[in-house]
């Protein structure tokens, strides 16, 4: 995944110093894009080991429309604990917006179901978009969405996905986001009878936190290895029927994990 290392290097060489909400401080650039062809392999970072279990369970949690950390904690995933209320609630974050976007009539819109149906029945549509950035609901979210919205594109029997991420923690968050949306693309492709095409990752404020600089420099000394493959249970036909056991990663040979503290 040289695209990712090129992003790290760009921010180190061109980035400007900025203060941030957490008080940690960052260096950042504005506007960057990476493209991953899923036919070439599953884009799971190899220059440090990632916790795939957390990525899969978080995505299933989003797709279930859940916004309480209990489901994640029950499966040993703690990545959302810092933002949860005492009862485990995170407010109207991703899963709520994806599956239950409030409409003006007092009902709700299931954006994922609508995306699936549009891909199947109107694949040339330029409106196959799922948004988590609900301006009217931001105050009801414990953490406003960093990966704000994504769009599907169908051509030549291939389904592609482009994500716009307004705020991108490059060292900790972005590797998770790449893998999560690449996996979502594979799942949606299977659920709609298409091949998985390109995942296009567009970043707004792409930043490295000041307490991750040494880790980033270490990572840049490592040579990327061959990408793994993600095998998905072919019997699953609905985007909502996937379980953790339906995913099998093969050929993953990463460099050792590099620890970094989360800026809350």
UniProtKB/Swiss-Prot annotation:
DUMP binds at residues 21, 126-127, 166-169, 177, 207-209. Belongs to the thymidylate synthase family. Bacterial-type ThyA subfamily. Homodimer. This is Thymidylate synthase. It is an enzyme of class 2 (transferase). (6R)-5,10-methylene-5,6,7,8-tetrahydrofolate binds at residues 51, 169, 263. It comes from Parabacteroides distasonis (strain ATCC 8503 / DSM 20701 / CIP 104284 / JCM 5825 / NCTC 11152). Its EC number is 2.1.1.45. Keywords: Cytoplasm, Methyltransferase, Nucleotide biosynthesis, Transferase.
């Amino acid at each position: 995944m040289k695209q990712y290392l090129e992003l790290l290097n760009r921010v180190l060489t061109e980035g400007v110093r900025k203060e941030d909400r957490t008080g940690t401080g960052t260096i950042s650039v504005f506007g960057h894009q990476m493209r991953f062809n899923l036919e070439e392999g599953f884009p799971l970072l190899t220059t440090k080991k990632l916790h795939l279990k957390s990525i899969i369970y978080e995505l299933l949690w989003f797709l279930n429309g859940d916004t309480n950390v209990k489901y994640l904690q029950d499966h040993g995933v703690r990545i959302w604990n810092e933002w949860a209320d005492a009862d485990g609630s995170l407010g109207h974050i991703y899963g709520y917006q994806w599956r239950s976007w409030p409409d003006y009539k007092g009902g709700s819109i299931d954006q994922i179901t609508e995306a699936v149906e549009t891909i199947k029945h109107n694949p040339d549509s330029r409106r196959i978009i799922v948004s988590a950035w609900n301006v009217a609901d931001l105050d009801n979210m414990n953490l406003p969405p960093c990966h704000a919205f994504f769009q599907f594109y169908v051509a030549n029997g291939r389904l592609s996905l482009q994500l716009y991420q307004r705020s991108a923690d490059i060292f900790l968050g972005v590797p998770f986001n790449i893998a999560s949306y690449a996996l979502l693309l594979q799942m949606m492709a299977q659920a709609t009878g298409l091949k998985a095409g390109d995942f296009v990752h567009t970043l707004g404020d792409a930043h490295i936190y000041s307490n991750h600089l040494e880790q980033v420099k270490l990572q840049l000394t490592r040579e990327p290895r061959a990408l793994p493959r993600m095998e998905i249970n072919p019997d699953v036909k609905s985007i909502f029927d996937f379980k953790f056991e339906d995913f099998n990663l093969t050929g993953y040979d990463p460099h050792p994990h590099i620890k970094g503290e989360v800026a809350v």
